[in-house]
Amino acid sequence: MSRYDLVERLNGTFRQIEQHLAALTDNLQQHSLLIARVFSLPQVTKEAEHAPLDTIEVTQHLGKEAEALALRHYRHLFIQQQSENRSSKAAVRLPGVLCYQVDNAIQLDLENQIQRINQLKTTFEQMVTVESGLPSAARFEWVHRHLPGLITLNAYRTLTLINNPATIRFGWANKHIIKNLSRDEVLSQLKKSLASPRSVPPWTREQWQFKLEREYQDIAALPQQARLKIKRPVKVQPIARIWYKGQQKQVQHACPTPIIALINTDNGAGVPDIGGLENYDADNIQHRFKPQAQPLRLIIPRLHLYVAD
């Protein structure tokens, strides 16, 4: 497929996402809102977009105010829709839930509508990340050449739909991206970097090359069977834990956008019990179960690369 055809499909798919989201938000407002609870988080400024989040203060919104914030959030796709001081790199998150009373016909209609939106979002992400054939560093410029100001993460994010929950609880999740590597795999990556000299602020080209050579020597000095691990922290994420009474099971969802809960009164479902979201404090985290960690030694800080002792 030619690059021109891909751009046409990209723009066409995005227009469909916008149209279907507009139709969904209009549709939801026609139905009976049983309960709505969302939690706005502080705005991340451009100056603080790379800073670690040690505390997050939560503001609760209820009822029609919460619904209005949620419906606007679903359609928040461009930086032009937010403050000029707000970071365009930090994710815009609004955890919470909207609960609507539905019958069988309305439930099926909304399920189909949301499924279609999620299919379009997945297709759009596939075009950008796979079909474009571009490395991650080049995708930003390519997407914004055709859709200026797009917040790509908001365009990718699918909507979460649940049916007849008994309870909904919110919380925070701290995660790490973990990848196991061999010594030779790391040496191969460093060798590629050494073969393409460049400057990386605040280092000059020569200083960066020297830094890479030192890293290469440190890894080469390890035994060939050394166990290496990238353990990169991910910014804390809001989550929702859903309990289904009939199935006697709990399901956990990431909750960057308000969940849509359909309460089917044809099937005798009742209004769920919805909890709040506490402020986040990194110094006050309680782990239900924390397994004994493997002893690790940091060897290349910029890569979050550790070696198992």
Swiss-Prot record:
InterPro entries: DNA_replication_term_site-bd, Tus_dom1, Tus_sf. Coiled coil: none annotated. Its main location: cytoplasm. This is DNA replication terminus site-binding protein. It is found in: Cytoplasm. HAMAP family: Rep_term_Tus. GO terms for cellular component: cytoplasm. Belongs to the Tus family. SUPFAM superfamilies: Replication terminator protein (Tus). Trans-acting protein required for termination of DNA replication. Binds to DNA replication terminator sequences (terA to terF) to prevent the passage of replication forks. The termination efficiency will be affected by the affinity of this protein for the terminator sequence. GO terms for molecular function: DNA binding. It comes from the Bacteria. It comes from Salmonella agona (strain SL483). GO terms for biological process: DNA replication termination. Keywords: Cytoplasm, DNA replication, DNA-binding.
